[in-house]
Amino acid sequence: GHDGVHPDALGRVLQGHHRLGRDDARLDYFLSRLPWWVPVAVEFRHDSWVCDEVFALLERHGAAYVVMSGAGLPCVLRATAPFAYVRLHGPDSDWLYGGSYSEADLHWWAERVREWQAQGRDVYAYFNNDGGGNAVRNARTLRAILGQ
């Protein structure tokens, strides 16, 4: 079950394979078949998806573009839905999905969160788990910076 998870917090995060290049028709078809009431965020792992036409397609469907940090992926600060979803994979370019964000980095992300909130968006931030426990520490620090 989902014990301890608020029902309004449930949604779907869809991740595209890093070899899956842009296919607007396929994305449009897929998103058009999802229930309108289920919040959806899409994480693209191929650079070809990062363009205004795809952002417009996501906006039409109310789907969020997943803003990413780390993992050698482009960090594009774009909100396409009533909520923003940020996936923080870790800042260490030598350690995939690892490392700890600095206090300065987390303050920078807190400012982005506040900007999206000022636009009336809910913001969800996910820190990629790692064996060193950095994700938990970073999430707690970000929450403290935001006063939550």
Model-derived features: where do they sit?
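Residues lining hydrophobic/aromatic ligand-binding pockets adjacent to catalytic sites
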Residues: 1-148
